[in-house]
Amino acid sequence: MSYIEKIDKNRIPQHIAIIMDGNGRWAKQRGKERTYGHQAGAETVHKIIEDAARLGVKYLTLYTFSTENWNRPQEEVAALMNLLVDSIEEETLMKNNIRFRIIGDIKKLPAEVQEGLSRCIEHTANNTGTCLVLALSYSSRWEMTEAVRQIATLAKTGEISPEQITDEYITAHLTTNFMPDPDLLIRTGGEIRLSNYLLWQCAYSELYFCDTFWPDFDKEEFCKAIYEYQQRERRFGKTSEQIS
């Protein structure tokens, strides 16, 4: 029986976050340039977005471009920016009733990229299905630094007192404040680390790591991750007896 058949359709994770890793190594195995891998990875993005929408995932957050990725070779960054504009298919989003959002330091993106993304956000704003969130020019340390800076400014001007700064207050000042924390974090490509991604939000997320490079990640592997998630007991610091 395939994992597509095994999963419980009534217990799909509300929020799935993915670190899409392995494009470059996938291309290298085939004697191709890294950009070839990124192009193949973009095709996988389209498929997984549609799979998530059909399964009823409420939020799908994809680690698309980190703040550290700006340090990559200039030609690779330029190719990624061009691919980003071309790969956001508004028609697919509208067909699947998908709402589009972005988190990250987007002011660093090229103007034409910002304009294209803003149009897509505006045009899909009233969609009520899966919310697709791209983490662009994003890192958790950047996000938390921005939140601390905002809160420190409010404290300096006397708008808040230190006693008002709670877990919830900090969460409200993060770029992800419009969605719940991830239930499941998936990382492809064989690496076992979080790479500065949603560190605050993934405090109690279930983690799934697989060796599959992102271009080869398909619906079966996606459903395997969901199945593994469904086999786990989420305790959030409590005992099994407390949550049963």
Curated annotation (Swiss-Prot):
Residues forming the catalytic site: D21, N69 (proton acceptor)
PROSITE patterns associated with the record: UPP_SYNTHASE
GO terms for biological process, alphabetical: polyprenol biosynthetic process
SUPFAM superfamilies according to UniProt: Undecaprenyl diphosphate synthase
Domain of life: Bacteria
Pfam families, sorted: Prenyltransf (PF01255)
Residues binding substrate, per UniProt: 22-26, 34, 38, 66-68, 70, 72, 187, 193-195
Cofactor: how bound: Binds 2 magnesium ions per subunit.
Cofactor(s) needed: Mg(2+)
Assigned EC number: 2.5.1.-
Residue pairs linked by disulfide bridges in the UniProt entry: none
Keyword terms, alphabetized: Magnesium, Metal-binding, Transferase
Annotated binding of Mg(2+), by residue: D21, E206
GO MF, one annotated term: prenyltransferase activity
Subunit structure: Homodimer.
PANTHER family in the record: DEHYDRODOLICHYL DIPHOSPHATE SYNTHASE 2, DEHYDRODOLICHYL DIPHOSPHATE SYNTHASE FAMILY MEMBER
NCBIfam families named among the record's database cross-references: PRK14830.1, PRK14838.1, uppS
Purpose of the protein: Catalyzes the condensation of isopentenyl diphosphate (IPP) with allylic pyrophosphates generating different type of terpenoids.
Annotated family: Belongs to the UPP synthase family.
Protein name: Isoprenyl transferase
Gene: uppS
